[in-house]
């Protein structure tokens, strides 16, 4: 019985060598096969140097468990989601460590319908079997097959189904794939739009997949990773910049001046894009920052619905509400017609179309929203006793709060400002978000007060 520390709350991630290696990948494949008893599973991998070897070890484990394997090659996580629901197979696994350091790799697991396998939905069971390693002998006669396939054309068809290509007017777009898996998909979309006669110019930087990440690990959430995209937008006079993380399940947008747009305001923008096409639809959002999304959705005739943060919660709530779209301020965007999964390609297509339809720049589309509901951005504080600190904050504001909500951590609302404070699931950190109604000095002052209370 070996303890496998690479099994995390939502996925598998570990340092290469002792935490994750080909033997462990083989065990995970066997365990997935024994637990789910799938007939066919799709596999893909990101650009990391170890992804191919880990994927093939995983395939061998699955085949030894009697599972047929379809390998879609180098791909983003969402291409595995797409392959799983499009082919109607029993599951999928993407080998990826997204934006983790160079010496890491990992896996994201789904079952039929691209439903996530995380902590309480099977991941612990797979872990238990992989740790025990007590597998039945391989039955050579019943061993699974292995086949390489390509679904990229069908995937591009699906992506372009979210917009009407005829709505696209002349646009110049900068793409930064960060040498991750997004590059070949961007090339394929460019070729398809060109063939359809769409007047969109693609300017591509760091587009070649390269597992050595010569330009750094792609994680545009970090300000130091945004400079190349910003400069390219300004240099080329582009209408918009789009940057991706390594497995492109998130995309990050920059306006025509190279300004990074916080994910919070993109949620409102995508909600608006969907409500133009689907009046009265329900939109799911997370509790960290809410006022802008609620205002935009309500004004557009939709219904905003708040869900606990995290992909498993958002997807589940979308299913129960039959919501067309769900967005988190962390740049994760979920789509009903994409099997409720998140995609980093659908958002920029919708925003590009919206820019054309509204005849306004991206900066113009979000400027009023940012002024109406200025936000602090997420501030992390490492505390010895997070629960006591949160209780201290609640006691301090208890009398003046107009509303208190515990959907996720502690949210308190006042006449012209609100905050959300939540403990991290994975580390001794509390995460603070503050927003106000059009009053930046108030938002900043309240943020200072909250941080002082937390750190007492």
From Swiss-Prot:
GO terms for molecular function: magnesium ion binding; phosphomannomutase activity. Binds 1 Mg(2+) ion per subunit. Pfam families: PGM_PMM_I, PGM_PMM_II, PGM_PMM_III, PGM_PMM_IV. Disulfide bonds: none annotated. The active site is at residue 98. Pathway: Nucleotide-sugar biosynthesis; GDP-alpha-D-mannose biosynthesis; alpha-D-mannose 1-phosphate from D-fructose 6-phosphate: step 2/2. The keyword Isomerase applies. It catalyses: alpha-D-mannose 1-phosphate = D-mannose 6-phosphate. Involved in the biosynthesis of the capsular polysaccharide colanic acid. This is Phosphomannomutase. It comes from Salmonella typhimurium (strain LT2 / SGSC1412 / ATCC 700720). The gene is manB.
């Amino acid at each position: 019985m070996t303890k496998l520390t690479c099994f995390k709350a939502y996925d598998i991630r570990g340092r290469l060598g002792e935490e994750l290696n080909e033997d462990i990948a083989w065990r995970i494949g066997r365990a997935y096969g024994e637990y789910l008893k799938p007939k066919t599973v799709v596999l893909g991998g990101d650009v990391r140097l170890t992804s191919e070897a880990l994927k093939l070890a995983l395939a061998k484990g699955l085949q030894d468990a009697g599972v047929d394997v379809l390998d879609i090659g180098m791909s983003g996580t969402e291409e595995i989601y797409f392959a799983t629901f499009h082919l109607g197979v029993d599951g999928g696994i993407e080998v990826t460590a997204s934006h983790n350091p160079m010496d890491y790799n990992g896996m994201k697991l789904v079952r039929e319908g691209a439903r996530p396998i995380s902590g309480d939905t099977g991941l612990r069971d797979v872990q238990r079997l992989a740790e025990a390693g007590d597998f039945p002998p391989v039955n050579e006669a019943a061993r699974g097959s292995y086949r390489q396939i390509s679904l990229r054309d069908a995937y591009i068809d699906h992506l372009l189904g979210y917009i009407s290509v005829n709505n696209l007017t002349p646009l110049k777009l900068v793409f930064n794939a960060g040498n991750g898996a997004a590059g070949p998909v961007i090339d394929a979309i460019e070729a398809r739009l060109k063939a359809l006669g769409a007047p969109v110019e693609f300017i591509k930087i760091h587009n070649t997949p390269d597992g050595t990440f010569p330009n750094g690990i792609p994680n545009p959430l970090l300000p130091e990773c945004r400079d190349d995209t910003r400069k390219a937008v300004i240099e080329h006079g582009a209408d918009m910049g789009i940057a991706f993380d390594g497995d492109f399940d998130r995309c990050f947008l920059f306006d025509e001046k190279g300004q990074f747009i916080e994910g919070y305001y993109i949620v409102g923008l995508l909600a608006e894009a969907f409500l133009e096409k689907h009046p009265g639809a329900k939109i799911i959002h997370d509790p960290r920052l809410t006022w802008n999304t609620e205002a935009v959705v309500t004004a557009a005739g939709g219904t905003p619905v708040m869900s606990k943060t995290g992909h498993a919660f958002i997807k589940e709530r979308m299913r129960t509400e039959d919501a067309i779209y769900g967005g988190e301020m962390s740049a994760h965007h979920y789509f009903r017609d994409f099997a409720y999964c998140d995609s980093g390609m659908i958002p920029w297509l919708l925003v590009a179309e919206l820019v054309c339809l509204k005849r306004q720049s991206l900066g113009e589309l979000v400027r009023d929203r940012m002024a109406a509901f200025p936000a602090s951005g997420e501030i992390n504080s490492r505390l010895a006793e997070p629960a006591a600190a949160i209780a201290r904050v609640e006691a301090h504001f208890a009398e003046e709060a107009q509303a208190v909500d515990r959907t996720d951590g502690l949210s308190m609302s006042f006449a012209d400002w609100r905050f959300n404070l939540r403990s991290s699931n994975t580390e001794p950190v509390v995460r603070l978000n503050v927003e106000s109604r059009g009053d930046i000095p108030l938002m900043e002052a309240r943020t200072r007060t909250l941080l002082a209370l937390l750190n007492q």
